[in-house]
């Protein structure tokens, strides 16, 4: 007779969870930030709001975003005028779009990740799907399983309505799944489409306007597993530890509410200030066990909520400008894609490191940190270890 302890030991992996492949996807429709204010005020029939348009232009100029991708085209918006109003009942139209498009965009990214991984998709044991764009039953996890033709016995986890910190959450969850189930291969997908949040401008709700200037669509997928098969699977980053916390005195700092008018966002407090004031505590808790206290000795992947957050974090921690290069690059090329952002940044970092001939996937460094920030105010902190290139 075997003991429970023996069974338990046999069920667990030996090494740490590792990212084995990354894939990303965006809708085809690309919008230049410099042209967006004119387009946005025209399509929402708001051109008479000249002062507000000037304010929006300034927001777009300061956003550090060059371009974004959006499922919503001019044609779609003309067919759905309620999406262009500030507060018109429009949830049905929004939902009809996202319940189809979110899994579809997720499939695009997942297909790329599976191809890079190079293993048969029948070896995928778990699916973790995350989106803040719409809800449905069965969920986007089920739709993705069907679209990809995964085994019906694949173990699924669906995360809805988490917001911008959730790129860290999916890594934390996938780490536990991979390390506690020997041989597990977890397909992680974050897919975000702004069709739930797009709306016309309003003079009194400027935080909504901030969202219109920042948010973009995108999907990212990872394959995560422990104990990579030598010569077959190629690890890119190891997941060493993961933590989540709610920042003190931050109630209502970022809120999202799903209502008849779609998903509305409210930024009620000094979000960049709250994050920069508390970030060192999270770093100390994560890196003290490793004996690391020089934040410039790490490679950095931070959710780019907006340029002000990055500027204040950089200033507070005295980070060298190049530390947030990959983060700023993704913000500039794609905008804020909510949960998918940090996964795009992981992809950008390992790509650039290979291109520049650096010795590791983490800008030549050994240890790194990934931060997710979002509603709560919630912070996810993931400690990463790079892999030699």
Curated annotation (Swiss-Prot):
The pathway entry for this protein reads as: Secondary metabolite biosynthesis; flavonoid biosynthesis
Tell me the domain of life: Eukaryota
What GO terms fall under cellular component here? cytoplasm
| Alphabetically ordered keywords of this record | Acyltransferase, Cytoplasm, Flavonoid biosynthesis, Transferase
Role = Involved in the biosynthesis of prenylated phenolics natural products which contribute to the bitter taste of beer and display broad biological activities. Chalcone synthase that can use 4-coumaroyl-CoA to produce 4,2',4',6'-tetrahydroxychalcone (also termed naringenin-chalcone or chalcone) which can, under specific conditions, spontaneously isomerize into naringenin.
Specify where it is mainly localized. Answer: cytoplasm
Q: What's the top EC group for this one?
A: transferase
GO MF, one example: naringenin-chalcone synthase activity
Q: Which family does it belong to?
A: Belongs to the thiolase-like superfamily. Chalcone/stilbene synthases family.
Q: Which PROSITE patterns match?
A: CHALCONE_SYNTH
EC numbers, comma separated: 2.3.1.74
One GO term under biological process is: polyketide biosynthetic process
- Supply the name of the protein: Chalcone synthase H2
Locations listed in the record = Cytoplasm
| Reaction equations catalysed | (E)-4-coumaroyl-CoA + 3 malonyl-CoA + 3 H(+) = 2',4,4',6'-tetrahydroxychalcone + 3 CO2 + 4 CoA
Q: Can you tell me which residues form the catalytic site?
A: 164
Against Pfam families, the record matches this protein to:
Chal_sti_synt_C, Chal_sti_synt_N
């Amino acid at each position: 007779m075997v003991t429970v302890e023996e069974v338990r030991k046999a069920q667990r992996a030996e090494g740490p969870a590792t990212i084995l492949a990354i894939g990303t996807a965006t809708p085809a429709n690309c919008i230049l930030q410099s042209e967006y204010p004119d387009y946005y005020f025209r399509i929402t029939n708001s051109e008479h709001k000249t002062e507000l348009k000037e304010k929006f232009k300034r927001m777009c100029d300061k956003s550090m975003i060059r371009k974004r991708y959006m499922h919503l085209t001019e044609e779609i918006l003309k067919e759905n005028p309620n999406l262009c109003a500030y507060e018109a009942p429009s949830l049905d139209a929004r939902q009809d779009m996202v319940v189809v498009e979110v899994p579809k965009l997720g499939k695009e990214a997942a297909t790329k990740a599976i191809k890079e991984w190079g293993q048969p998709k029948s070896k995928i044991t778990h699916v973790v799907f995350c989106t803040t764009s719409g809800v449905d039953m069965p969920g986007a996890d089920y739709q993705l399983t069907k679209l990809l033709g995964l085994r019906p016995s694949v173990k699924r986890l669906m995360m809805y309505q988490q917001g911008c910190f959730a790129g860290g959450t999916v890594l934390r969850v996938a780490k536990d799944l991979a390390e506690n189930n020997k041989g597990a291969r977890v397909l992680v997908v974050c897919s975000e489409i702004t069709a739930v949040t797009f709306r016309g401008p309003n003079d009194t709700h400027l935080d909504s306007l901030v969202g219109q200037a920042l948010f973009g669509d995108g999907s990212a997928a990872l394959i995560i597993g422990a104990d990579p098969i030598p010569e077959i699977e190629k690890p890119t980053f190891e997941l060493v530890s993961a933590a989540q916390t709610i920042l003190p005195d931050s109630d209502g700092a970022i809120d999202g509410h799903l209502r008849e008018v779609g998903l509305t966002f409210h930024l009620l407090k000094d979000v960049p200030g709250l994050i920069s004031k508390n970030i060192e505590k999270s770093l100390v808790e994560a890196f003290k066990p490793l004996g690391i206290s020089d934040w410039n000795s790490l490679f950095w992947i931070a959710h780019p909520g907006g340029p002000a957050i990055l500027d204040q974090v950089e200033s507070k921690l005295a980070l060298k400008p190049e530390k947030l290069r990959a983060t700023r690059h993704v913000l500039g090329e794609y905008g804020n894609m909510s949960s998918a952002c940090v996964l795009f940044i992981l992809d950008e970092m390992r790509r650039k490191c290979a291109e520049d001939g650096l010795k590791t996937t983490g800008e030549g460094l050994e240890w790194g940190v990934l931060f997710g920030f979002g509603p709560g105010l919630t912070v996810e902190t993931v400690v990463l270890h790079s892999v030699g290139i």
